[in-house]
């Protein structure tokens, strides 16, 4: 095949020289039902077919990082579902729509995504009322992880995915991540854990989520934020603080899960008719 192709090229391009070691142009031939001959290739996303690595639950916020984390896991063949924590009236319907839009953008790479929208308002207010304010962020994160895990198990997911990057904010120090992981009994994957913000933004721009992520609508992680949040939380102390929630929290978590809204988000693929 190579000899026949080479002979044809030489006959039709008599001025072309053959250099098998350092060619300026490489000719590629793929044999399937027919022969495909080409001289350039465009790099795609790469990775594995979605679904070949089972199912995982993505904690999807309105920020830059979590959509990138979902995209990166989808590249490795993971089927994505997502959970978003909504806190009306402190977070608006536009904030919710922003997350739906982000899920749709990620679905262009991951296929259909079931987006579980959990009303987190009552739980946040209860934690704010009962727990030390410097621990608010971590305790709220711990309950998000608990809820996400319960939904994940219900949906037969084998792991959780978050968009945390170590040291980026107070809730993402090594100690803080250990404190949130302590309440989970399934693996937590953090694909962007060692990336800096510029590296994450570069991927977000490539997958077209960046412009949506920077829309100025607050999510529930940006409200009730302590002025001086703890950055080296003690897990035993967190557990002691959470005892203040014992009277109502289990029932509140159960209600939030049972009353969640589920949206099946599908890709908006645009096809151009051949001219």
Q: Model-found features: residue ranges?
A:
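RNA-binding accessory domains that recognize and position tRNA/RNA substrates
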Residues: 1-57, 67-113, 121, 182, ...
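Active-site adenylate/phosphate-handling loop in enzymes that bind or generate adenylated species
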Residues: 4-15, 40-53, 124-125, 129-202, ...
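Conserved G/P- and acidic residue-centered "switch" motifs that form tight phosphate/ATP-binding loops
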Residues: 63
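Short, conserved beta-strand edge motifs with alternating hydrophobic and charged residues
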Residues: 83-84, 115-119, 158-164
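A glycine-rich phosphate-binding loop feature that marks nucleotide/adenosyl-phosphate handling sites
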Residues: 119-122, 165, 218-225
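A short alpha-helix-loop-beta-strand transition element characteristic
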Residues: 208-216
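The feature marks non-catalytic terminal segments
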Residues: 215-270
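Conserved small/polar residues in nucleotide/adenosyl-binding loops
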Residues: 271-275
């Amino acid at each position: 095949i190579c000899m026949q192709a080479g002979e044809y090229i030489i006959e039709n391009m008599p001025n072309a020289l053959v250099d098998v070691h350092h060619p300026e142009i490489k000719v590629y031939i793929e044999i399937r039902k027919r022969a495909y001959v080409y001289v350039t290739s465009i790099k795609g996303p790469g990775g594995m077919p979605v679904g070949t690595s089972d199912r995982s639950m993505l904690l999807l916020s309105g920020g830059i990082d979590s959509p990138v984390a979902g995209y990166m896991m989808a590249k490795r063949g993971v089927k994505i579902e997502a959970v978003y924590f909504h806190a009306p009236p402190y977070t608006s319907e536009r904030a919710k729509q922003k997350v739906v839009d982000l899920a749709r953008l990620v679905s262009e790479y991951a296929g259909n995504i079931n987006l579980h929208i959990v009303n987190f308002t009552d739980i946040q207010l209860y934690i704010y009322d009962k727990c030390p304010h410097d621990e608010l962020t971590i305790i709220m994160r711990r309950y998000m992880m608990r809820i996400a895990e319960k939904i994940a198990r219900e949906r037969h997911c084998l792991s959780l995915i978050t968009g945390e990057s170590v040291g980026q904010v107070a809730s993402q120090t090594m100690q803080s991540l250990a404190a949130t992981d302590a309440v989970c009994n399934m693996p937590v994957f953090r694909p962007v854990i060692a990336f800096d913000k510029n590296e994450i933004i570069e991927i977000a721009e490539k997958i077209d989520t960046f412009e949506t992520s920077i829309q100025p609508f607050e999510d529930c992680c940006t409200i009730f934020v302590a002025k001086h949040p703890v950055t080296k939380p003690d897990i035993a102390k967190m557990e002691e603080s959470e005892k203040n929630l014992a009277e109502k929290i289990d029932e509140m978590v159960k209600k939030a899960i049972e009353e969640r809204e589920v949206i099946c988000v599908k890709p908006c693929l645009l096809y151009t008719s051949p001219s």
